[in-house]
UniProtKB/Swiss-Prot annotation:
Top class in the EC scheme: lyase
One GO cellular component term: cell outer membrane
Protein role: Lytic transglycosylase with a strong preference for naked glycan strands that lack stem peptides.
Signal peptide: 1-23
Assigned keywords, A-Z: Cell wall biogenesis/degradation, Lyase, Signal
Family, as annotated: Belongs to the RlpA family.
Disulfide bond positions: none
Protein name, per record: Endolytic peptidoglycan transglycosylase RlpA
GO molecular-function term, one example from the UniProt record: peptidoglycan binding
UniProt keyword Membrane present: no
Enzyme Commission identifier(s): 4.2.2.-
CDD domains per UniProt: DPBB_RlpA-like
Length: 294
């Protein structure tokens, strides 16, 4: 029995060592402040909770993988320092953490201050902010890093970061991280391109009054997003080569690059058809398929 217990403890120590060894230093690889990035087991079940009469549904890891939102960020008041968070951890204003209403606890996000383009990585370990119009509540350290202390609130972009067991990075933030890579190792950590096309459920943060007795019905809608084109002209050329006048195509500016959104599509077969056409064009830019509830 003692030998068996020893073997189990040894195995657990090995697992802990491997996981620790795979911690990613975002400062070294991408020049970003934040916690060490460590693989977390995927969250496979969502749950509901109610605050101030409003019901929220948390996202699974699969649903959250394409999460990218622009909105208003705030940061914790000093009085919350030392209090317990929704994850059970104690809030420490000097660590890079944040509160979000629906993203999985212990997931990571890249937060960009859209006024000055300063960035920080934070770990979600709490729920909130429960103030209308705000999408994330940052720790004081994170807010300071992106220049929010003076204003108190700011317009930000929040993009999810996901890691697999090998420590490779995917999720909505991967395109932004690719532009920040300091070396080849940083580039190699990112899952991008044709081999990493992902089908991700992009769930809007819809709120329903707790008094509602029947769940609302939503229609699943799909969009295709192509990342990191070098110019608007290149984006327009790709749309022209695709030759699909029946499909809406929107070009958006992403810092010094351009993205294309095709859709919305109400049928997954349409999505697969357009993906196949893009492949025939030998298109190699990162391609993500989003689904969301309309």
């Amino acid at each position: 029995m003692k030998q068996k217990i020893f073997q189990i403890l040894t195995a657990l120590c090995c697992i802990f060592y491997v996981m620790s060894a795979q911690a990613i230093d975002a400062k070294k690889l991408y020049g970003l402040q934040g916690p060490k990035l460590i693989y977390q087991a995927p969250v496979t079940k969502s749950h509901h909770y109610v605050v101030k009469g409003v019901s929220y549904r948390t996202q699974t890891s699969k649903e959250a993988s394409g999460y990218a939102r622009d909105g208003i960020a705030s940061f914790y008041h000093k009085k919350f320092n030392g209090r317990k968070t929704a994850s059970g951890q104690i809030y420490n204003e000097n660590l890079y953490t944040a509160a979000h209403k629906t993203l999985p606890l212990n997931s990571y996000v890249l937060v960009t201050n859209l006024r000055n383009q300063r960035k920080v990585i934070v770990r979600i370990n709490d729920r909130g902010p429960f103030v209308k119009g705000r999408i994330i509540d940052l720790s004081r350290a994170a807010a300071r890093e992106i220049g929010l202390i003076g204003s108190g609130v700011g317009h930000v972009r929040v993009e999810l970061i996901q890691l697999d067991r090998q420590g490779r990075i995917s999720g909505a933030a991967s395109a932004t991280l690719a532009k920040l890579a300091k070396n080849q190792e940083a580039v190699n950590m990112l899952l991008q391109g044709e081999d990493t096309v992902e089908l991700t459920q992009h769930t809007e943060e819809k709120t329903v009054k707790a008094a509602t007795t029947k769940p609302e019905k939503y229609t699943t809608v799909y969009k295709i997003r192509i990342l990191n084109l070098d110019s608007k002209k290149q984006a327009e050329k790709l749309i022209s080569k695709l030759g699909r006048e029946d499909i809406r195509a929107d070009i958006t500016v992403n810092q010094d690059k351009f993205d294309i959104y095709f859709g919305p599509f109400s049928d997954k077969s349409q999505v697969n058809d357009v993906k196949a056409q893009l492949r025939k064009l030998n298109y190699s830019k990162p391609l993500i398929v989003y689904t969301f509830d309309d």
